[in-house]
Swiss-Prot record:
Its main location: membrane. Its EC number is 3.4.16.4. It comes from Buchnera aphidicola subsp. Baizongia pistaciae (strain Bp). One of its GO terms (molecular function) is peptidoglycan glycosyltransferase activity. This is Peptidoglycan D,D-transpeptidase FtsI.
């Protein structure tokens, strides 16, 4: 009986102990739940914004979203500058170090080094040097085949981003005009630079959230992005191609420093071709360095004295002042001006005003210039915008030189001004003068970008700068230049009436003295019955035994213009 009660007491004690333990356990659970809920409440309500901010610092990033650069095409849609897809190989150094990845030259890294032609030591140096950065470029503009190979290596921290690079289908034929871009796809020469904002648009920004491996898991709306635009040039690639080859052959055969050819549509003012030779390949990056003289578009960046190509304007002014008629006979023997002898290449005692242009007589225009006030000589040059930029929109175009503010002009100044010395212009500005003459004195802006309203704008800004009747008379005189006995007879095209003027100018050296180096010109238009195409040819420093414009440039003019008239099915007008 005693044992029974003793045992019952023990059971009671055990039950009480068990109950106490349950109570303690339940209390601990309840306390834990309360603590967890309190912590959750604290995190979710009190400091949630702060934690989200800190988290975002690790995973939320702003990404720049670039546009595909706009294409450049000719007037018929042929591509002059396009984008081809490439890849950029990138590394996340911070990710590699945060994961405490042991970077060592294993086989995969060696394969990466080999395919990119980057020494392994350099790769590791870049990673270590930028260990606090999430992003560095390892290689730019990699072919997709190479990037796919790298992708299959599955190297931690290596990322591949889409990109593009410029390709120029016509290469050397359009390089100085079109230019090229840098590694960031920004235009740094030619049309690429001049219209860079239009071609690039404006990149936008978007926020992305990444996981611990750098993969994008969420992205927010793109903001502030302005779309890029394509550009259509007035250039006709069919013209550009054959003009380049003809001019290039002429430059080589004459051992010249370089040549420029410009073709303009006279009625519209559109530039149909702008050629420089020798040229360079814009697809070969090794040729794209700043001091390469081949990069300049010399049609707009270089200025030269114009030689006899300015003489028609002196004749115009003399006709306007009724000093002469086309049949007026003028003394063309040598004359002395301020102790300087002015003479012609071929001696003629006297010539008609028309023959002064035909034979390109310096003495003839000199005597006319001496009879005209200097202010009126400057005025006629200014009316044809000599010395002024064409405002074509191409960066790098220079103004010419026409000293309108000079107070004291000697007779020698007037005389030399009449045959193209003491003033300077770009080849494009010379082409503009003769385009205006071909339009019978109606000046319109030149253009190289095709727009729906181009002709409307050109009409708005057009103005008659000189008497239409007088200019028609001068055009008839210029027609004689290409006939037998004329300075430009080698430019003659059978069956067609053409109006041309040749020119030859000595070059000034760095000391301001004239060297025995020359610039040879011919500029004119066809057909005379309906002036449609203006062509300017300039050959710089021919080193053959010939250097006169009529000998060097005239045959080039003939070959090119003859082909243009044939391609465009312009009917012969010589017998109309």
């Amino acid at each position: 009986m005693k044992y029974f009660f003793q045992n019952k007491k023990n059971i009671h004690i055990k039950n009480e102990t068990f109950n106490n333990r349950i109570t303690i356990l339940l209390s601990l659970i309840i306390i834990t739940i309360i603590l967890v809920l309190s912590r959750i409440t604290f995190l979710q309500i009190i400091v949630s914004k702060k934690l989200i901010y800190k988290s975002n610092l690790r995973s939320l990033r702003t990404q720049i979203e670039f546009n595909q650069r706009g294409n450049i095409t000719d007037r018929l849609g042929y591509p002059l500058a396009i984008n081809i897809p490439v890849k950029n190989i990138c590394i996340d150094p911070k990710l590699l170090f945060s994961k405490q990845t042991h970077i060592y030259p294993n086989l995969k890294w060696k394969m990466l080094s080999t395919v990119l032609s980057i020494p392994l030591s350099e790769i590791f140096y870049r990673i270590k040097y930028s260990k606090n950065n999430h992003f560095i470029y390892l290689a730019h503009k990699v072919n997709p085949e190479i990037s796919e190979y790298i992708s299959q290596l599955h190297i931690p921290g290596i990322y591949i981003l889409d990109d593009f690079k410029r390709f120029y289908p016509f290469g050397k034929l359009t390089s100085q005009l079109i230019g090229f871009t840098n590694i960031d796809n920004e235009g740094i020469e030619g049309v690429e630079k001049s219209f860079n904002k239009l071609l690039m648009g404006k990149p936008g920004k978007k926020q992305i959230i990444t996981d611990r491996y750098g993969r994008i898991i969420e992205q927010h709306n793109l903001v502030n992005k302005i779309q890029s635009h394509d550009i259509i040039l007035s250039i006709d690639c069919s013209f550009q191609k054959f003009i380049y080859h003809i001019l290039n052959q002429a430059v080589m055969s004459n051992k010249a420093k370089f040549g420029v050819a410009i073709l303009v549509n006279i009625p519209t003012g559109e530039i149909l071709s702008m050629v420089n030779t020798p040229s360079y390949d814009p697809n070969n990056s090794s040729e794209l360095f700043k001091n390469n003289p081949l990069i300049r578009n010399k049609a707009i960046t270089d200025i030269f004295e114009l030689g006899s190509t300015v003489k028609p304007m002196i004749i115009m002014k003399a006709l306007e002042k009724k000093i002469i008629t086309p049949e007026t006979v003028i003394n063309t023997s040598s004359l002395v001006v301020n102790k300087h002898i002015i003479h012609d290449v071929s001696y003629h005692h006297a010539l008609t005003a028309s023959d002064i242009l035909k034979k390109s007589s310096n003495t003839g225009v000199s005597r006319l210039a001496l009879s005209i006030p200097i202010s009126e000589l400057i005025d006629i040059y200014s009316k044809f915008e000599l010395g002024k930029s064409t405002n074509l929109g191409l960066i790098g175009e220079r103004n010419g030189v026409l000293n309108t503010n000079k107070k004291h002009w000697s007779d020698l100044d007037k005389v030399t001004l009449s045959f193209g010395y003491g003033l300077m212009a770009t080849p494009l500005q010379l082409a503009r003068i003769y385009t205006t003459i071909g339009r019978y004195g109606l000046s319109k802006p030149l253009s190289i970008i095709v727009k729906n309203d181009t002709n409307l704008k050109n009409d708005i800004f057009s103005k008659q700068v000189f008497s239409k009747k007088i200019i028609k008379t001068v055009i008839n005189m210029l027609e004689e230049v290409a006939k037998p006995g004329g300075a430009g007879f080698k430019a003659a095209i059978k069956g067609y009436r053409i109006a041309v003027k040749t020119g030859t100018a000595k070059k000034i050296n760095s000391k301001g003295k004239y060297d025995n180096k020359y610039v040879s010109y011919i500029v004119g238009f066809a057909p005379v019955s309906n002036p449609t195409f203006c062509l300017m040819i300039m050959i710089n420093e021919p080193k053959s035994n010939k250097y006169y414009g009529g000998e060097i440039a005239a045959p080039i003019f003939k070959t090119i213009m003859q082909k243009i008239l044939k391609i465009k099915n312009i009917k012969p007008d010589a017998y109309l």
